[in-house]
Amino acid sequence: MVQAGGNCGMHVHKFVEHFDTIYTFEPDPLNFFCLVNNLPYSNVIKIQGCLSDENKLVEIEKPYGDIGSIRINKNVKQGKIPCFTIDELKLDHCDLIQLDIEGYEMFALRGAKETIKKFHPLICIEYVHFQHYGTDNKEVDNFLFSNGYELVAKYVTDRIYKYVPFNLRIS
């Protein structure tokens, strides 16, 4: 499993018993400190950084002043926080990608193209704030639909997509 927007570990804590290995990403130093202390599990690999479609260094900001709304500052060209791609993890398997990264989900999905094609994981994303980075919900949907995914559930601001082979699609 790959999870981004780890915050203080609340989401990951719920997944620990269900996945052999969980990679969780959190860029904010204070949140990451809490995450490390809240998740002492050996199957959780904690990475202080962001997910993107390329390796780079970024700055983060808290536009609303709270620890749950951290996002990449698009006005700063180079920062101190590393970005990684999911594909570079070279996973042996991946059953779930869960992204809550304040509108940067499309970039993380682009950086997971090979992982998505190889493993067809369930994908759960927060479905808001895309416009901050020049993307939108249509771009996210088109990317997932073109890779064989269908929307299977909505919960508040989250969307869950499941891979369905083209030959098994009804529509």
Q: Model-found features: residue ranges?
A:
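Phosphate/nucleotide-binding beta-alpha loop and adjacent structural elements of enzyme active sites
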Residues: M1-S171
